[in-house]
């Protein structure tokens, strides 16, 4: 029981809250916070009316019920006092209005007593409203009040010029007009003021000033972009970048705006935005100070040059006129007239010359521009025709392909179409992303051959593939690209080759040709490489017309074959390869020489010919031969691509582990090295796996808290999920 009572007392103590105003502690229900409403008003609003301060709504104030009731009564008292003060302040204003109404009535009573001649009816129309007041109100006014009202009326009339003018007319003027304009005359009353001869000059001046302002507004705005002064310190910079860095580092401005607009308050951080702002909002152009200075200097030079020319012409004419002067004296007036006429004539002549020059220059410029435009048009027409022909494919068009029944077929569109969902996209990159995201194909083959409909992954591979079709169309009987296996032996072909030939290797009859004169002939070295079969080398040498050498230039045919006897060729010049084909591996070349005479020549004769040809070779050819790299090997990637593209009677090979089919032995070796040669060793359990799937699957039993490491020796990557690891092993290793 004691414990229960203690708990109840504790709860009572906790619920009691202390008042901030009177300090008494009461229950939480009888205490009001700042947000609570008492008799339709918040406690904070009541405190603001009493203290005349702005009190935040989140003020942690607590007031008891008694204090809040006293605050409410004091707030009501303050509001009542305000109302009485406002009511008292409004009463004097009403009395002054009554005084203003009484003033014209007293003046009218005085005017009735004294006989006054008639006034202008137009000026007395304002005083007709006085008849509305009773006569007792007018007669009962005291003289003292009249004097006070009259003395006080001009002070109020200063604020209203219309009333002041009317009162002055009624009091002081008889059949006369006096104008007292206000400080600023409105535009609507300028015409009325001009009737009396005043304000005309002002209006003209205003118009001229406005016109000048409009003319000045149309010109470009010049801003100095090479002088930046910090307004907060003495920092000075010539370029914007260091000035921005200074404002960011020293003054803490995150985005400093260093280009202010001279026509408004806005500032900009980039000069381009300032130019756009001036163009769009103010319809003005921007010019730097350097450009304006250059323009001004050019204008000054042009003006000074024109003045100098005019002065020189005037001096010349004066000298001529002085020589041709008659002896008779003329009056000063005639002399001045002659001088003026001469100067005007000189100016007219200069203007005519300038106009003639401009006309001739403009005609020449028009002629040159016309020729240029004609040439440009011709070039553009030829280029457009070429582009149109390039867009049209050589294959036969049908209306069914284009999907139209028009009389003229259209060129195929360059859009890429998905074979799965028939989606058309503009670029190859978009199609690749579409195939990856929508159809989940890792390596999409987007480029398609229009001849054999083979799909390829890159544009370069499509080009190399198209060369195969082009080679097949040009030479259908020639065999396709052959892979030459011996890489270390190079074929060097020169115009002067040393060949050991016998009578058994002669293939054709000798052709006898005689040189008609002893004149020297040009050495022409033509190396013609046919489609992987025949290379013809034609050498025309300088020969002497002797009994021993009656033979003309020899034509040598070098035929590549596998079964003939191999001869190593000495020399240094390699036969150029066609640019469309890829680099091929060089190997042994079997040579069979067809000489130009009836019998096979002796070795001594050939050696003599060789010595002569070497003597006749120019020094430039020798230098070129010496600079040639004889041991050129194709790049590994190009070699592998040529191996992969070759289809010359190759049997397909298959991998004994995964069953993949390849077309060459080197492809199979590279596949074995990449996929099956690497051993995967787990860094956690130290087990070795040959298969990638087994290695990834063993992590279900092995602890994978620290991640899934790549099992390759030199690879240190770690992955969080198994699919990431498997894709890494499949693509990289």
Curated annotation (Swiss-Prot):
GO terms for molecular function: DNA-binding transcription factor activity, RNA polymerase II-specific; rDNA binding; RNA polymerase II cis-regulatory region sequence-specific DNA binding; RNA polymerase II transcription regulatory region sequence-specific DNA binding; zinc ion binding. InterPro entries: Znf_AD, Znf_C2H2_sf, Znf_C2H2_type. It is found in: Nucleus; Nucleus, Nucleolus. Transmembrane segments: none annotated. SMART domains: ZnF_C2H2. Residues 90-100, 285-316 have a biased composition (Basic and acidic residues). Residues 90-121, 285-336, 499-525, 540-622 are annotated as: Disordered. Residues 592-602 have a biased composition (Polar residues). The modification Phosphoserine is found at residues 109, 153, 176, 600, 642, 646, 654. Zn(2+) binds at residues 19, 22, 64, 67. It holds the Pfam family zf-C2H2. One of its GO terms (cellular component) is nucleus. The modification Phosphothreonine is found at residues 180, 188, 647. Coiled coil: none annotated. The keyword RNA-binding does not apply. A zinc finger (C2H2-type) spans 228-251, 259-282, 416-439, 447-469, 653-676, 708-733. One of its GO terms (biological process) is maintenance of rDNA. It comes from the Eukaryota. Keywords: DNA-binding, Metal-binding, Nucleus, Phosphoprotein, Repeat, Transcription, Transcription regulation, Zinc, Zinc-finger. Disruption phenotype: RNAi-mediated knockdown produces various phenotypes that are the result of reduced rDNA copy number. These include a decreased number of progeny, a progressive loss of fecundity over successive generations, and a number of offspring from male knockdown mutants, exhibit a bobbed phenotype (abnormal cuticle patterns on the abdomen) which is characteristic of decreased rDNA copy number. In addition, the offspring of knockdown mutants display reduced rDNA magnification, a process by which an X chromosome with insufficient rDNA copy number is induced to recover copy number. PANTHER family: ZINC FINGER PROTEIN 142, ZINC FINGER PROTEIN INDRA. Named after the Hindu god Indra who lost immortality due to a curse from Durvasa, likely referring to mutants displaying a loss of germline immortality. Belongs to the krueppel C2H2-type zinc-finger protein family. This is Zinc finger protein indra.
């Amino acid at each position: 029981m004691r414990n229960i009572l203690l708990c109840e007392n504790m709860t009572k103590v906790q619920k009691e809250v202390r008042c901030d105003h009177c300090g008494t502690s009461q229950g939480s229900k009888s205490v009001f916070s700042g947000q609570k409403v008492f008799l339709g008003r918040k406690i904070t609003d009541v405190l603001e009316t009493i203290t005349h301060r702005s009190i935040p709504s989140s003020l942690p104030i607590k007031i008891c019920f008694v204090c809040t009731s006293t605050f409410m009564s004091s707030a009501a008292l303050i509001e009542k006092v305000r109302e009485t003060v406002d009511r008292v302040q409004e009463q004097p204003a009403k009395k002054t209005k009554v005084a203003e109404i009484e003033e014209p009535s007293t003046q009218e009573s005085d005017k009735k007593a004294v006989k006054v001649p008639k006034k202008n009816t137009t000026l007395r129309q304002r005083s007709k409203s006085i008849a509305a007041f009773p006569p007792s109100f007018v007669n009962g006014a005291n003289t003292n009040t009249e004097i006070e009202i009259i003395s006080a009326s001009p002070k109020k009339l200063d604020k209203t010029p219309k009333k002041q003018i009317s009162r002055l007319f009624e009091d002081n003027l008889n059949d006369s007009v006096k104008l007292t304009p206000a400080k600023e005359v409105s535009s609507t009353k300028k015409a009325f003021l001009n009737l009396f001869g005043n304000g005309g000059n002002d209006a003209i001046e205003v118009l001229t000033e406005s016109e000048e302002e409009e003319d000045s507004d149309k010109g470009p705005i010049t801003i100095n972009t090479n002088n930046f002064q910090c307004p907060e310190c003495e920092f000075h910079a010539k370029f914007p970048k260091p000035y921005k860095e200074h404002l960011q580092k020293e003054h803490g401005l995150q985005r400093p705006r260093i280009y202010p607009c001279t026509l408004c308050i806005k500032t900009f951080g980039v000069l381009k935005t300032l130019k756009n702002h001036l163009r769009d909002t103010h319809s003005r152009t921007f010019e730097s100070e350097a450009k304006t200075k250059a323009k001004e200097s050019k204008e000054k030079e042009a003006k000074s040059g024109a003045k100098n020319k005019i002065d020189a012409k005037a001096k010349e004419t004066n000298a001529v006129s002085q020589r041709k002067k008659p002896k008779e004296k003329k009056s000063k007036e005639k002399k001045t007239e002659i001088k003026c006429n001469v100067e005007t004539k000189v100016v007219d002549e200069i203007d005519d010359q300038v106009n003639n020059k401009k006309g001739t220059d403009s005609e020449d410029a028009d002629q040159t521009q016309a020729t240029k435009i004609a040439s440009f048009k011709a070039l553009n027409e030829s280029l457009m025709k070429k582009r149109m022909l390039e867009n049209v494919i050589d294959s036969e068009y049908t209306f069914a392909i284009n999907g139209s029944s028009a009389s003229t077929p259209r060129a195929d569109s360059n859009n890429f179409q998905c074979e799965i969902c028939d989606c058309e996209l503009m670029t190859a990159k978009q199609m690749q992303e579409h195939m990856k995201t929508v159809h989940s194909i890792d390596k999409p083959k987007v480029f398609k051959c229009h001849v054999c409909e083979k799909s390829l992954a890159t544009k370069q591979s499509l080009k190399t593939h198209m060369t195969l079709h082009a080679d097949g169309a040009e030479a259908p009987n020639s065999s396709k690209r052959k892979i030459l296996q011996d890489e270390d032996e190079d074929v060097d072909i020169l115009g002067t080759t040393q060949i050991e030939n016998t009578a058994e290797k002669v293939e054709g009859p000798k052709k006898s040709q005689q040189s008609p004169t002893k004149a020297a002939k040009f050495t022409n070295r033509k190396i013609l490489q046919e489609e992987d079969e025949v290379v013809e080398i034609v050498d025309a040498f300088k020969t002497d017309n002797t009994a021993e050498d009656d033979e003309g230039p020899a034509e040598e045919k070098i035929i590549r074959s596998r079964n003939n006897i191999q001869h190593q060729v000495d020399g240094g010049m390699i036969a150029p390869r066609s640019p469309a084909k890829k680099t091929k591996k060089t190997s042994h070349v079997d040579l069979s020489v067809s000489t130009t005479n009836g019998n096979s020549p002796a070795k001594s004769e050939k050696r003599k010919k060789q010595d002569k040809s070497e003597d006749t070779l120019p020094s430039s050819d020798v230098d070129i031969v010496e600079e040639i790299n004889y041991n050129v090997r194709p790049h590994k990637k190009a070699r592998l691509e040529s191996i992969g593209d070759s289809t010359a009677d190759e049997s397909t090979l298959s991998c004994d582990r995964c069953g993949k089919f390849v077309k060459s032995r080197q492809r199979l070796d590279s596949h074995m090295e990449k996929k099956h040669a690497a051993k995967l060793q787990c860094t956690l359990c130290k087990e070795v796996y040959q298969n990638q799937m087994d290695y990834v699957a063993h992590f279900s039993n092995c602890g994978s808290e620290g991640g899934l490491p790549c099992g390759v020796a030199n690879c240190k990557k770690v992955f969080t999920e198994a699919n990431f690891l498997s894709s890494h092993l499949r693509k990289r290793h």
